[in-house]
A protein has these predicted regions:
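Juxtamembrane intracellular "pre-TM" segments in multi-pass secondary transporters
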Residues: 1-3, 188-217, 241
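Extracytoplasmic gate region of multi-pass secondary transporters
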Residues: 28-29, 211-265, 321, 325, ...
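Helix-breaking motifs and short loop linkers at transmembrane-helix boundaries and internal kinks
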Residues: 40, 72, 93-99, 127, ...
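Conserved MFS/SLC helix-loop-helix module at the cytosolic interface between two early adjacent transmembrane helices
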Residues: 59-98
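Structural signature of the two symmetry-related core transmembrane helices
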Residues: 75-89, 282-300
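Cytoplasmic helix-loop-helix junction between adjacent transmembrane helices
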Residues: 103-142
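Helix-loop-helix hairpin linking two adjacent transmembrane segments in secondary transporters
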Residues: 138-182
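A late C-terminal transmembrane helix in Major Facilitator Superfamily
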Residues: 333-370
Length: 415
């Protein structure tokens, strides 16, 4: 394999891994109508299942970053994938809520290391001018899994039990983990880069003392509250509010997820293009972030329009959200030393997943007690604007590649 193509080969492999992770987490929401024929699940219980996944996902997102910084990307990513694949298979053995909740908890634990691992692969192999594009491609894996989930799950349901969905997904993940162990290698210079001129891994307490880190975590908390609600509840909204059956969900639910994939790539491509044209790192990251956030309010109109227009509005919002997501997860690779990239990415992801868990629980309770989807979509549509304002207020000027914010004036910069 040519040396210049190897980084992009690894980016492709990571994209597939993220696709598998999203297929696994989407299997339950897409198949919920079939599962409910065997296991009664209310709106509040559905919210609990998603919150259970997100709670452990949050904890292991933070811990997974530290885990990867300690044992490395190759082994850490493979262990993570194998863990969540086994957890996915456990869903297929469930006959009640107890095992389903346990399976969701274990699934979140495994998937928590996925994006920190992706961030480390990018930091190990690619320069700053290519990282946003690479993260955009990897983030498009979220769409890959989400787009394939409705039609594939619909096909499996036509052929047999909903339980086979989870066994099929688990087999994909275990195959990927074995392949990753065989093919992945760190670049020869990574060992010397990991300390970047003597900078040791930064302790979590010092990271959390930085206003920049707290700003990124807070922004992700808000934006992922919106994203995880849309991700998990879109199929259920189509079932409950629009009267869809599994065949209609299989035909149409993939469309907004496909738009999210285009957003993942487009945001990173646009940011990298601005950098190549000589614009500052600060401008090249923040302009696309702001434009992405401006698309999310489209979901506010969803309950008030026809189903065709609702799918279009979902698509616009999903495009903006995943453009945003890829860009915000690129920021740790820009301004933190490689030795701490996994930890910072983990803390940011922790904030996002905790936001998703809390918002999912709140959504389930609101729907159970008479609130409509209109109220929820109004809140969801406003969160990215607040998140972007927080990011602008806390991030300061993003430094050019090679400038470490923790080395300015010999002390930690927290403003």
């Amino acid at each position: 394999m040519r040396k210049d193509s190897k980084p992009w080969f690894f980016v492709a492999l990571v994209t597939v891994a993220i696709g598998i992770s999203y297929f696994d987490r989407q299997a339950l929401p897409v198949a919920i109508s079939a599962i409910q024929r065997n296991i009664p699940i209310s709106d509040a219980q559905f919210a609990l299942l998603q919150a259970a996944f997100l709670a452990t996902y949050a904890l292991l997102y933070a811990g997974g970053g530290k885990f990867l910084d300690t044992i490395g990307t190759k082994v850490g990513f493979a262990v993570s994938m194998a863990w969540w694949s086994v957890a996915c298979a456990l869903h297929g053995f469930a006959h009640g809520m107890v095992l389903l909740v346990m399976a969701r908890l274990l699934l979140g634990m495994g998937e928590g290391a996925a994006f920190p691992a992706a961030t480390r692969v990018i930091a190990e192999w690619l320069p700053a001018t290519q990282r946003a594009t690479a993260m955009g491609i990897i983030n498009a894996g979220t769409a890959l899994g989400s787009v394939l989930a409705p039609p594939l799950i619909g096909l499996i349901l036509l052929l047999g039990s909903w339980r086979y969905i989870f066994f099929f997904a688990a087999s994909l993940g275990l195959t990927w983990a074995a392949g990753w162990l065989v093919v992945y290698r760190q670049p020869a210079e990574v060992a010397s880069r990991q300390t970047e001129g003597g900078v040791a891994p930064i302790p979590w307490l010092r990271l959390l003392a930085s206003r920049r880190v707290l700003g990124m975590v807070s922004a992700k908390f808000l934006s992922d509250s919106a994203w995880f609600f849309c991700l998990f509840w879109l199929p259920k909204y189509l079932y409950d509010a629009r009267g869809f059956d599994i065949k209609q969900v299989s035909y149409f639910a993939w469309i907004p997820y496909a738009a999210s994939g285009l957003g993942s790539f487009s945001g990173g491509w646009f940011s990298s293009r601005l950098l190549r044209r000589g614009r500052s790192l600060n401008f090249s990251r923040k302009l696309p972030l702001g434009l992405s956030a401006a698309l999310m309010p489209a979901v506010i109109l969803v309950p008030h329009v026809s189903v065709s227009l609702a799918l279009l509005l979902f698509s616009i919002a999903f495009f903006g959200q995943q453009s945003w997501s890829g860009l915000i997860m690129t920021l740790p690779t820009d301004v933190f030393p490689l030795s701490s990239v996994g930890s910072v990415a983990g803390l940011i992801g922790f904030g996002g997943a905790m936001g998703g868990a809390i918002f999912n629980l709140a959504a389930g309770q609101l729907l159970t007690h008479g609130a409509g989807y209109g109220t929820l979509f109004a809140v969801v549509g406003s969160l990215h604007a607040v998140a972007f304002a927080i990011l602008l207020f806390t991030s300061g000027v993003l430094r050019p590649p090679g400038t470490n914010i923790f080395q300015e004036r010999g002390k930690l910069v927290s403003s």
